[in-house]
Amino acid sequence: MTKRRVGIVFGGKSGEHEVSLKSARAVMNALDPEKYTVIPIGITRNGQWLSGGDPLLALEQQADQKMLGRTPQAGVVSETAIVQSAGSLPEQTNVAALDVIIPVLHGPFGEDGTIQGVFEFANLPYVGCGVLAASVGMDKGLMKSAFAAAGLPQVPWQLVLRRDWQTQPEAVYERLEATLHYPMFVKPANLGSSVGISKVSNRAELATGMAEAAGYDRRIVVEQGINAREIEVAILGNDDPKPSVPGEVLPANDFYDYADKYLEGQTQFAIPAELDAATSEQLREMAVTAFKAIDGAGLARVDFFVERETGAIYINEINTFPGFTAMSQYPKLWEATGLGYSELLDRLIDLAIERYHERGR
């Protein structure tokens, strides 16, 4: 059997750089060496593309690029590195020879349609959502608008531009307090993994949370906090997506933050979640609706709130390339549904190639 050549792209310029490295390590360890030849391709924080040697180890150790045994071209960016591969990547990693790419990238420049557009331009099969779905799924404001159009219920929320907050902070605070009540969650519109998110209970905390979020993005989403269970559903597929069993996040702190997700926090998970059959099925159906609402492909994780007092379900967000570490919910949800980690990767690669041929029709 001819092995498929799989390019694993990781790192990147976003605030989720370290998360990407953890996910990439797990993916590379899980790919069956009898089926695949793995070609690691790293992206530094300043956008340089690295290959040859061990770029993942180099980025993990924050080592000098000389560790790779070569000096990458200064300022190499997406289009140059991918399309003109001979000029920026060693011959043995010519991306034109790859059968498929897994962009194990989270956040801006990786999960937001940017790199997906590069792969489309270069006519390369890749795992995951296309340009449109990735873009909408990354921006919480656009995502929420798509969910509203699909009829999915959400908690009240407001979008704030960083410039408005910087020039008229008191007016912004008054608008938020008039439309929402404390506690609120303040989030950068274009980051995931709970990076830059704050739970705020008064105006002083709101000001601090706005400053934190504004450090990451020019668009800030502020949501109404509710007393709710956090439920997640994994999605797998293209035009006929399938949902996993629901799982519940049991955070040790006020909310499921970055430290709990990736730094061996105290958060626990219940998979499958303890839900009645009707609620479980409704969550799974809503997850599929959300995936289709953004024209998703390959994979996603859809997060929900289930209000404790009423049982009402609200969609929170969709993650178009969720974390893939050993601690991550997405592979755990599929394992509980009957699909192991390595088999999940096999299926994602098949879906990427199927979608590539579908686009070529």
From Swiss-Prot:
Domain of life of the organism encoding this protein: Bacteria
One GO location term (cellular component): cytosol
EC code(s) of this entry: 6.3.2.4
Residues that coordinate or bind Mg(2+) 1: D303, E317
GO BP annotation list: cell wall organization; peptidoglycan biosynthetic process; regulation of cell shape
GO molecular function, one term: D-alanine-D-alanine ligase activity
One Pfam family in the UniProt entry: Dala_Dala_lig_N
Binding-site positions, Mg(2+) 2: E317, N319
Reaction catalysed by this enzyme: 2 D-alanine + ATP = D-alanyl-D-alanine + ADP + phosphate + H(+)
Primary location class: cytoplasm
Residues that, per the record, bind ATP: 177-232
Keyword terms: ATP-binding, Cell shape, Cell wall biogenesis/degradation, Cytoplasm, Ligase, Magnesium, Manganese, Metal-binding, Nucleotide-binding, Peptidoglycan synthesis
PROSITE patterns given in the database record: ATP_GRASP, DALA_DALA_LIGASE_1, DALA_DALA_LIGASE_2
Reported cofactor(s): Mg(2+); Mn(2+)
Keyword presence, tRNA-binding: no
Cofactor note: Binds 2 magnesium or manganese ions per subunit.
InterPro entries reported in the protein's UniProt record: ATP-grasp (IPR011761), ATP_grasp_subdomain_1 (IPR013815), D-Ala_lig_Van_CS (IPR000291), D_ala_D_ala (IPR005905), Dala_Dala_lig_C (IPR011095), Dala_Dala_lig_N (IPR011127), PreATP-grasp_dom_sf (IPR016185)
NCBIfam families: D_ala_D_alaTIGR (TIGR01205), PRK01966.1-2 (NF002526), PRK01966.1-4 (NF002528)
Protein name: D-alanine--D-alanine ligase
Lineage, top ranks: Bacteria, Bacillati, Chloroflexota, Chloroflexia, Herpetosiphonales
